[in-house]
């Protein structure tokens, strides 16, 4: 079972937007040393929308090779074309990923039946564990609990990243699926409470810059130690909030640059963090113990 703190890894780039393989290697080592339980590569935070197919495969391949089986590697392979999602998922399997994360189709706004058929088709086409990903704030497509329940019985579909931040939604999903279906948080601000309800981990933006704290939080929440988990959560809350002061992954890439872990690169149409946001984020990093 893949569980715990799963970092939604950034994809390092130089100032011209070229992929920085040395920094990627440095980040993977950072997470292996700091107790991250799994790495999610080329997801939303990894700027999958602006990577070409060859870059997408190469990031997965390099992360898988460096991790060398020590922790699971989950590859983002979602697309708003079912055919493309099958291709990306096949590529990820061939590159050695342990599982795939598939966001709901964005922009074309399928019906619930369309979502069921989309994910079922991918699951039947590629034999690899697959995690659904619901984030309607970014996709304009909301997969309802009834659809999740239907999909939870499909072979190869093993869980969902629920990123609405709505704990009632998480409760509804948990109540409608079997106990072996994995429900993960995709919202750092509410992750601790979702895990205390029975969720199996957090696919986290904050873990990029505070991996040890997020690992400890997830471990405490999953063993039912609410007091410890909530105490860590309170310390991380300034960071959880400020890492979304502009669109993700703009702030988290700036924070990692501030920590000396990667250059100042991001791809258009995203732009580097505006100067007015620098000090609020720097202060949140200090409050959360990331900077001294």
Swiss-Prot record:
GO terms for molecular function: 4-hydroxy-tetrahydrodipicolinate synthase activity. It is an enzyme of class 4 (lyase). NCBIfam families: dapA. It comes from Pseudomonas syringae pv. syringae (strain B728a). Pfam families: DHDPS. CDD domains: DHDPS. It comes from the Bacteria. Gene3D superfamilies: Aldolase class I (3.20.20.70). It catalyses: L-aspartate 4-semialdehyde + pyruvate = (2S,4S)-4-hydroxy-2,3,4,5-tetrahydrodipicolinate + H2O + H(+). Its main location: cytoplasm. It is found in: Cytoplasm. Catalyzes the condensation of (S)-aspartate-beta-semialdehyde [(S)-ASA] and pyruvate to 4-hydroxy-tetrahydrodipicolinate (HTPA). Belongs to the DapA family. The record marks 44, 107 as: Part of a proton relay during catalysis. This is 4-hydroxy-tetrahydrodipicolinate synthase.
